[in-house]
Each structure stands twice: as C-alpha cells, then as structure tokens.
Amino acid sequence: MSNGIGEKIKYFRIKHNLTQEELAKGIVSVSYLSKIERNAADPNPEAVKKLCERLGISPEKVLDKDIANDVMRWMESLLKRDLVLAHDLYQGIQTNIEKVIDADLFCLVKLHTLYYFVLTKQTDKAKQKLKLLKQDQKHFSKKETYYWLKFKAHFEYAESSYEKAFLHFQEAERLYSDVFKGDSEEYYDLIYHVAKTATVLHYSYHASVYAERALIYYRDHYRLERAAKCHILKGVNYKRIREMDEALKQFELAEALGKRLSSDTILFRVYEAIGELFHDLKMPTQAIRYYSKAYELVKHQFSVQELNAILGHVKTYIQCDKQEFSKDWLEKADTLLKTEKNMPLRYVYQVKVLRFVLYGFTTQFEKLLVKEVIPYFKSRKLYIAYATYVRLLGDYYYNNRKYKLAAEYYAEAHQAMVDIQHTDNK
C-alpha cells in the first residue's frame, strides 16, 4: 500500500470535483476519509481499495523509474530558467501525476509548480497554488520547507512585496545547510536573489556582499549571463555609495559579457544603469545617450523595461530644463500605460507624479500622494521611493506656506532613510 495513498486520494477526489461526503458515501465516514487524506490514520486496506475504485486509480504504488528522472530534470530546468524545456516536462508530469505521487515526489512537484507559475507569469494560478500550499506547510519536511520559503519569496517579489521576499529568501538560506550537502548551483541561485532583492530595497551592504559571493561562483563556473547580472548589481550599489568610477567599471564588465552573449536583456540593463549613473552625476547629455541606447533595445515591447527607458528620458530632460522634450516622452509613457494595463503600480505612480511636475501641482497631487502613493511605498517598505515622495509632498506644503505640515513630512523622509540604514546593518 502506498504511504502517500492519502495524498493520491485527495488529489484525484479534487480532480473529479467530488466533495469528501460524495466520495465517502457508503464506504467510510467523512471524518475517517479526512484522516486518510491527511495521512493521519492507518488506512483500512479494504476501505482504501473501494475509494480508489470509485476514483479509478490504483491503491498500490505504480512504480516507474523514469518519473523521478523527469521530475528532477523539470526542477533543474526551472532552476536554470529554461522555460521551453520546463513547459514540455511539466505537461508530461501532469499526465503521469499518479506515478509522481507513488514516487513520493508529489509535494516537491506542488512546490515547484508554484515557481513554474511565477516564472511563466500565470499569476492567478500562482495565487491559487500558494493558498493550497499554505494549508500543507505544517506537514512539510525540511527540504520541502526550504523550497516553500524560496518559492514563496519569488511569488512575493513578483507581487512587489520586496521586504517579505527578502526575509523569506534569508530564511531559506538559513535552512539550506540542513537540507543540502555543500554549496551548489541551488545555493548560489538563492544568494543571487538575496542580492537582487536587497538591491531593490536599497540595502546596499547586503546587496554588495551577496552579489560578490554569487559573482565568484558564476564567474568560476562560466555562467556568464548570471555573472553579468551580478556585475550590474555591484555597479548599482557602488553608484549608491557614490563610488562612480567603480560603478562604471562594473557596468562595463557587464556590457562586455552582454555583447559576448549577444544578450539584449543584459545590454538593456547595462545601458539603463549607466544612464542612471550619468543622471545622478548631472551629466544629461551622456545620460540621454545611454537611455536612448536602452530604449532602442526595447521599444514597442510595451514592457516595464520600455517604460523605464522612457522615464529615464523624462527625468533627464526635466533635469536639464528641456520641458518640451520631457512632455513628449511623458506622452509615450501615457500611451504605453493605456496599452499595457498590468504595469506594476510603482511605475504607474511615477508617470502620474511626473505629470504634476511638468504641468503644475494641484490639490489632486496632494490627494494622490496622501491617499495612494505614499501608503503604497510605505506598506512595501520601499523606503527610498517612499522618502522621495514624502519629501516632494513636503515641498508642496512648503511652497503653499503650510510650514508645519512641510516640517512633519521632511522629518518623516529623514526617518525613512534612517530605517534603511538600520535594517541594512542587521
């Protein structure tokens, strides 16, 4: 009798759209079926046989030595983000799910399915899978808990809940040595994503340390695309601590790898990052040159990347007081948002606020920031963006002679910066 018979019965009961009452009728009590499905009772063989007959499945293990290999290949394809292979293997695994259950791989498959849905941007399915997995988490083994933390973090990152993602990636890291022997690609994939998430949150110390650790591994193992991404992360964090020469060096190393790989994805990130560097240095001519190179790689894709390149132009033309150029590029941003309805809110808010910057501040600006923008960034602990918008609202109040309110918002912006340093130093 399969040790995972409860999981098998539950899976196929749900697949056949049967309630526990419908499946149990005339065979066992509902409470006993519930215990069988949770593997909380030693199942009666005769009862299990009848339940399986009703579901059209075998009460015995259907052993297939190939299914374990297929599952391992699928997990590896997800780790390497080979989505074409992952899709093909996923179809085969779903067709042979009974064999997966009998091989005691069902829980690992369920966990990796969450990650598969995240990578393939099947958001609704990912949310549904996350909800179901939460119900099972207290029964996870250490290995299953590791993947649960890691893949939940990926889901949270995709949902812009970066602080939650960061904490769960770190929890997974602490559990890693209890599950795996030695440092593997799995480990450095986790380390890379800690660095990436820390960079979004402006945790410069964590981002730099983790990016360097990941870079050494990917460079030594000739994983050039990941190595390039690590150089970009290091460059971004050097820029934030005003080490501009070192930042540019990292970006140039990434650019060389991007050209070697003929990777527009890498080159876009490099050109965008160099554009930001020159923008920060108040060198608008150079900034526009790189933002334009970035834009040429992604125009007409209606993507976050295209919007970022557009916003780089808007902000840089504002910086050098070329308002008409800024307005032209802002119209491109508006057109993109009308076409692509699912753009993350952090970018939508940038466009809305820049419109006020270019066309004048009104009471609608105050309402937008107080009711929507500031709460959004505060709730996600995106403190740099939060501080920027809080300070902008402070300027609005100051210019309208509401000095007490302005002082309160300036103080809040300062506290947000302190909070970043405090969290990064933990």
Model segments located where?
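DNA major-groove recognition helix of helix-turn-helix/homeodomain DNA-binding modules
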Residues: 44-61
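Short alpha-helical DNA-recognition segment
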Residues: 16-35
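Amphipathic alpha-helical segments of tetratricopeptide repeats
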Residues: 91-98, 130-138, 170-181, 212-223, ...
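Structural register within alpha-helical repeat arrays
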Residues: 73, 113, 152, 194, ...
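Alpha-solenoid helical repeat architecture
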Residues: 101-107, 140-147, 181-189, 222-229, ...
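A short, Lys/Arg-rich alpha-helix, primarily the initiator
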Residues: 1-15
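Structural motif corresponding to the intra-repeat A-B loop/turn of tetratricopeptide repeats
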Residues: 80, 120, 159, 201, ...
